[in-house]
């Protein structure tokens, strides 16, 4: 999700999102389920959210929707949910680029066109968004947002006029787009899920009684009492309609799969399974690898809440050094990684975490975290640990150094903002104030997820597809 430099587009950091959809064939109201599903995906985006619903027994094409800035529980009060009654619906959580936190850019997007209505929610990023947008504008398209999700929605609506079904229109549209996308789409009588052929972004299927569910992560299924059925396969389009059956077809492409490894390192919730791999177990394996690769004499292994905790436990189990909690987390402060400005990130670190002095005083600490992007968080935490009496702080990072930008929707920005692109490991160690620093060796990264093919381009620049030559900040958002 990148901004353009033109007028309404803004320069800044990229975003990650969560999508959710449900179709209850018994006619039950789904808006409460969407609310709880989005709440379970809140870690994937905290700046805006939205819900769009329809009633398959009502007037064809009538969609009710509401979007707002803030957390799910802030935007959707009970009275608002009561206005969004329907037995089919989709939802979205988002965090945005600097300056683009607007309701207009919140999702789901709802289009009314010749064939009826279409609502769409998107997680990911298109690498040819500017090219497609220019082509569409040259043929009369008028866009109302600065997000590339609108390009997808507009493309489907255009192709639908010449297609027998929405699915056919989707197939025609995805032939033209390049990038990462997990989509949930609601047409008047169908719920549709789409996953890009590389499998870069996650999407799974669940079932609760006579309702079908789509979600970015399995934790959202659990939150509404749905059973996990399976992941949507890379390149697959799944459809749920009044027959109650799951219909599947695949894009006619054959590409090497490249699942985003950062889902397992940081983004996904600990209790989720993605592509049949437990996020928790993947992080445990990562921590164990760090212990084997970078052993150190220490008294306590601690993780940075939340995404560093499981890796710290893995380090502890492998090394035999006791595991402990060094920090208390204020759960009412959002992730530092997804704050839109550097100043907000720095202040957020100190408000979000406080040191348990009685635990760390006089101890040699191994501090495990998921990544170092700018160095903001880890430097502050080391200072806090030392002020609380820690005698040594040894940092272990469960990902390799970030050296290259991500073009597919993960908040890994341009090279100038990546500390590892201009500093050696020793220079970073000195800058953050650690006694030692060890990153996950890139050759060991695969061990976290077994034989699952992964994208690790932000570490080695081996992108799974051709990416733009211009700076990433010149791309559209999603």
Q: What are the roles of these predicted feature ranges?
A:
Residues 174, 189, 225-231, 383-478:
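PRPP-dependent phosphoribosyltransferase catalytic core
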């Amino acid at each position: 999700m990148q901004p353009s430099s033109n007028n309404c587009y803004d320069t800044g950091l990229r975003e990650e999102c969560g999508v959710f959809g449900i179709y209850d064939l018994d006619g039950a109201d789904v808006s409460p389920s969407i609310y709880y599903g989005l709440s379970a995906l809140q870690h994937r985006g905290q700046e805006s959210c939205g819900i769009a619903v329809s009633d398959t027994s009502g007037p064809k094409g009538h969609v009710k929707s509401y979007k707002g800035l803030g957390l799910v529980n802030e935007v959707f009060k009970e009275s608002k949910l009561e206005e969004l009654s329907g037995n089919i619906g989709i939802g979205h959580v988002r965090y945005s680029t600097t300056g683009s936190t607007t309701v207009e850019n919140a999702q789901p997007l709802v289009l009314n066109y010749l064939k009826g209505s279409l609502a769409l929610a998107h997680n990911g990023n298109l690498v040819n968004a500017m090219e497609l947008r220019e082509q569409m504008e040259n043929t009369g398209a008028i866009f109302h947002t600065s997000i590339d999700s609108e390009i997808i929605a507009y493309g489907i609506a255009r192709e639908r006029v010449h297609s027998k079904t929405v699915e056919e229109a989707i197939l025609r549209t995805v032939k033209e787009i390049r990038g990462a996308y997990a989509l949930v789409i609601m047409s008047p009588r169908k719920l549709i899920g789409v996953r890009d052929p590389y499998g870069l972004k996650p999407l799974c299927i669940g079932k609760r009684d006579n309702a079908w569910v789509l979600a970015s992560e399995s934790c959202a299924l659990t939150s509404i009492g749905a059973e996990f059925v399976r992941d949507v396969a890379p390149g697959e389009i799944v459809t749920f309609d009044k027959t109650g059956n799951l219909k599947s077809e695949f894009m006619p492409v054959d590409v090497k799969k490249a699942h985003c490894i950062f889902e397992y390192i940081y983004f996904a919730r600990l209790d989720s399974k993605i592509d049949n791999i437990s996020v928790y177990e993947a992080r445990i394996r990562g921590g164990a690898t760090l212990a084997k690769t970078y052993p150190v004499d220490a008294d306590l292994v601690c993780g940075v809440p939340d995404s560093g905790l499981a890796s710290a436990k893995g380090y502890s189990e492998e090394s035999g050094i006791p595991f402990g909690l060094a920090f208390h987390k204020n759960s009412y402060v959002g992730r530092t990684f997804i704050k839109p400005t550097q100043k907000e990130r720095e202040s957020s670190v100190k408000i979000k975490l406080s040191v348990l002095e009685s635990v760390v005083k006089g101890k040699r600490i191994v501090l495990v975290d998921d990544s170092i992007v700018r160095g903001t968080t880890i430097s502050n935490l080391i200072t806090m640990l030392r002020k609380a009496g820690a005698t040594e702080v040894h940092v272990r990072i469960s990902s390799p150094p970030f050296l290259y930008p991500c073009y597919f929707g993960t908040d890994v920005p341009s090279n100038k903002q990546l500390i590892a692109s201009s500093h050696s490991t020793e220079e970073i160690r000195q800058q953050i104030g650690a006694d030692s620093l060890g990153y996950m060796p890139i050759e060991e990264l695969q061990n976290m997820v077994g034989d699952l093919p992964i994208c690790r381009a932000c570490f080695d620049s081996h992108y799974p597809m051709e990416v733009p030559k211009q700076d990433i900040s010149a791309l559209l958002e999603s």
